[in-house]
Amino acid sequence: MAAAAAAAAAVGVRLRDCCSRGAVLLLFFSLSPRPPAAAAWLLGLRPEDTAGGRVSLEGGTLRAAEGTSFLLRVYFQPGPPATAAPVPSPTLNSGENGTGDWAPRLVFIEEPPGGGGVAPSAVPTRPPGPQRCREQSDWASDVEVLGPLRPGGVAGSALVQVRVRELRKGEAERGGAGGGGKLFSLCAWDGRAWHHHGAAGGFLLRVRPRLYGPGGDLLPPAWLRALGALLLLALSALFSGLRLSLLSLDPVELRVLRNSGSAAEQEQARRVQAVRGRGTHLLCTLLLGQAGANAALAGWLYTSLPPGFGGTGEDYSEEGIHFPWLPALVCTGAVFLGAEICPYSVCSRHGLAIASHSVCLTRLLMAAAFPVCYPLGRLLDWALRQEISTFYTREKLLETLRAADPYSDLVKEELNIIQGALELRTKVVEEVLTPLGDCFMLRSDAVLDFATVSEILRSGYTRIPVYEGDQRHNIVDILFVKDLAFVDPDDCTPLLTVTRFYNRPLHCVFNDTRLDTVLEEFKKGKSHLAIVQRVNNEGEGDPFYEVMGIVTLEDIIEEIIKSEILDETDLYTDNRKKQRVPQRERKRHDFSLFKLSDTEMRVKISPQLLLATHRFMATEVEPFKSLYLSEKILLRLLKHPNVIQELKFDEKNKKAPEHYLYQRNRPVDYFVLLLQGKVEVEVGKEGLRFENGAFTYYGVPAIMTTACSDNDVRKVGSLAGSSVFLNRSPSRCSGLNRSESPNRERSDFGGSNTQLYSSSNNLYMPDYSVHILSDVQFVKITRQQYQNALTACHMDSSPQSPDMEAFTDGDSTKAPTTRGTPQTPKDDPAITLLNNRNSLPCSRSDGLRSPSEVVYLRMEELAFTQEEMTDFEEHSTQQLTLSPAAVPTRAASDSECCNINLDTETSPCSSDFEENVGKKLLRTLSGQKRKRSPEGERTSEDNSNLTPLIT
């Protein structure tokens, strides 16, 4: 007894020292009487793995479920070492382990029901335990020990693999009726003899059938367990479907469907709206039901499914694998597929119909969960202070419209208008304004003449900003085009007069003002154009308001409809992209029909300035003195539409070619007298520069041609040779004196036009440049105009020649039907020699040799005043022109008239003289039978006697 206690104490010390894991050692021998001395080597046993509830220790009995495999650790104390090798028994039936070896071994034998292996006398029909251990037929086949004992890693312990087979049909019920399964005891072979360990040593194993759970509770049949799992899964799917179908319907959407849906949708929305109105109560009810169903399903599957399975191999790591998470995995998959995916797929497409048909069930569930869910719903309402719903903000509504574009029946323009209206509050003026550099503006000192009004009308704008000075950002007024209704461009009214009269208010906004605010201001009638400004605090100094541009009502409307509005005058589709409008049959307005006629002055000057100009030219400018040109012809010349001109100065492009009146080494044929403004003159190769003002003139040599005689040229020799003619009076003329005419054979005023317009002989090339410095008004007379004026003056001063009476043949009293046009047949060849513009027969008494030397003078582009019309007002619309081919000329040495435009109404010849000369000339010409050559040229005889006229 003392030896056994000492051995037990020694084994306990070794176990405490070696087993650091803290495992509980099941030393059953300490709980029972001392075993026989022969069995002292087996001390106890315990299962290595009890996870999953398949193997457990209850009441000193090892319990295992059928179909499991587990690892068993046994503790023993080896006997004293043998002095000699054991002598084997002669036969296997006399006490050997049954395998032919002498190694220790464990086997299980089945105990009879109710026996428990307590005493051999309790079961008289069976032999005692040690005797049964020797018989292999008594070894249990349902509990199998796999392989021999293996070292357990700790002295005095060993490991052995135990597998419990499936119970045969009917054994589970019999075992269950007797105490919850079949009972097995342990037999141990120590190498010399078999030892039976039963209930006395705590070495019993009870195998329970699968009908019992981990705690030994009786489980229902498999079909009943499957049906319960399906019912719980269906309940979870029901709650999930109701939650998706009811809570996905927003109250706002239900109101929309109730008012604008189909008949079925209106009825369904009406039924659902009452339940959906209590959103938080409904939400708590459905979530509580779904959570309970999912939890019940997980517990049901845990008790119904095996947590793992074992194998038959010798290695635990290969065959004894357990899956305690298998029920959780099956539950998760079932809930995911059956309670989430399927309900969502159906309810997302038919949510309203499902919700309307399940209203009664929903009300029943809400009533059942009322004690718990109603207070919780009220608490949520108090905490959130609004119903749980889907509220669409402006941004969300915009994104909803964009996302629903492929599925909605809205056209693109309607969608753009909706989006533009919703985005109006998010945009500021700076994003849509027209920059100041792109605005059409007028200076406050502008004059509303024809050019300015035409430019305003051509721009197409109805409201035009007016700025003061040279800074465009200094906007002082607004001009409305309708304000020009009573303004005559001929009056040259100052713009400031009109703007001060109407006194339109300026509407200014800041660059960060929202478009909806500006639209409200425009709707109040203040103005449809606003000036955009910002506070400029950059740099040093005080902040100031800086004008950035303008914004109009049209700009805001374009942002609302998200499209450009184009009218007939727009040049760009977008002010920011600068994309030009395609020219699609678009015509620019031509206002030339409203201009002054050619007989009126295009540039208006005061009568005082016209008189001063006339006096200055008649007294100071040599070619226009009364010696060469009469004052009456000079006045007509100044009143010519193209003589007095204006030129605007562009500050942005000061070196523009149109700013030069003369350019060095560029041939010209006109004379210029500056009336208003300033010019800069650059002289010679040295580039000497100086400024000149009003009443300075240039280019006198340009109008002096070979049409003058040698004496005439010598009279104006100081004028003809000046390279730089910049004088206010003839006394200040300087330069070369060209005293001879380039054409010596033609020295009078009737020179040849071929020689007159020869580029090598008659073109004047100045060696100076004249550049304007401001807006100028000047007199510009071309060489042709001056020659026409000379000829008109010469014919005006010539007396009527009596030789012209020779043209009369006694029929002078017969007046023509139209003045200057005789009554001749339409097929008369003389008609082809007449021109309907400004024709007049005049005599040349100074040197005419015969009456046939009559010429017709054409005064090209020279207007005559209405006050000089005398006797021929009723015949002023028709004139007679004689082609140069029909005009007989005299020798080249004689002076002759040029082709000059001369009004018959102001001719110095009398009316009788004109009528007689016209009739005689036509009759004379009609009597000559001359034919044109096939090439349309005159005969050589005619060409030899004619000199072409100036055109």
Swiss-Prot record:
Domain called CNNM transmembrane: residue spans: 218-414
Keyword Lyase: no
Positions of region (Disordered): 116-135, 731-753, 795-830, 920-951
Residues carrying Phosphothreonine: T821, T824
Function according to Swiss-Prot or TrEMBL: Probable metal transporter.
PANTHER family xrefs: METAL TRANSPORTER CNNM (PTHR12064), METAL TRANSPORTER CNNM1 (PTHR12064:SF28)
Protein's name in the database: Metal transporter CNNM1
Organism: Homo sapiens (Human)
